[in-house]
A protein has these predicted regions:
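C-terminal structured domain segments
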Residues: 96-156
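Detector for Asparagine
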Residues: 4, 11, 22, 38, ...
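Generic hydrophobic, helix-prone segments enriched in Leu/Val/Ile
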Residues: 14, 47-51, 67, 114-118, ...
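Short, charged surface segments at domain edges that flank catalytic/cofactor-binding sites
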Residues: 1-59
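Histidine-centered nuclease catalytic patch
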Residues: 62-93, 102-114
Length: 156
């Protein structure tokens, strides 16, 4: 009679245990399809002031070409559909058309290295312009804990 409820509880507890050992965040939300339906994407516009510090000319992270303002988009390097989070350490400026065409692919290691280097440079600027803020602290922690690489490995 309670088999479905019990099965859900066991799966949920199992994913909590996995999250203790696995650096891939939100495993339970990935395992349960219903969680995904309830998650809504938020506007990334609040990150522009930070991204502008390191990339004031709005050069596409992937193509290296300057982006016209009307074609400027903020993108997750590691797909949002894998991490379900909007963190500065994973966000870059891209051309809208490129962003639409790339889909939810897991990036190559060279892209991860480029993002890691970008974050180091961005952190230096943020520590001067936005010291002691939550966003700066999160970026610093992501670098110190190698979060990009761990998340990338978890997505693969």
């Amino acid at each position: 009679e309670y088999a479905n409820v019990l099965f859900d509880v066991i799966n949920y507890r199992w994913t909590q245990k996995l999250e203790e050992f696995n650096h891939s965040p939100r495993i339970s939300q990935k395992v349960r399809g219903t969680d995904r339906e309830n998650i809504r994407r938020k506007s990334l516009a609040k990150f522009r002031k930070y991204l502008d510090l390191e990339n004031p000319d709005h050069v596409c992270f992937h193509t290296g070409r300057k982006i016209k303002y009307e074609n400027l988009s903020i993108d997750h390097v590691l797909p949002w559909s894998y991490l379900f989070s909007d963190n500065l350490w994973n966000l870059v400026y891209v051309d809208k058309s490129f962003n639409s065409s790339k889909g939810n692919i897991i990036p190559k290691e060279e892209t991860i290295e480029k993002l890691e280097n970008r974050n180091i440079h961005l952190l230096k600027s943020m520590e001067i312009k936005f010291p002691n803020t939550k966003v700066t602290d999160e970026l610093k922690l992501s670098i110190e804990t190698d979060l990009i690489r761990k998340s990338w490995v978890g997505c693969k």
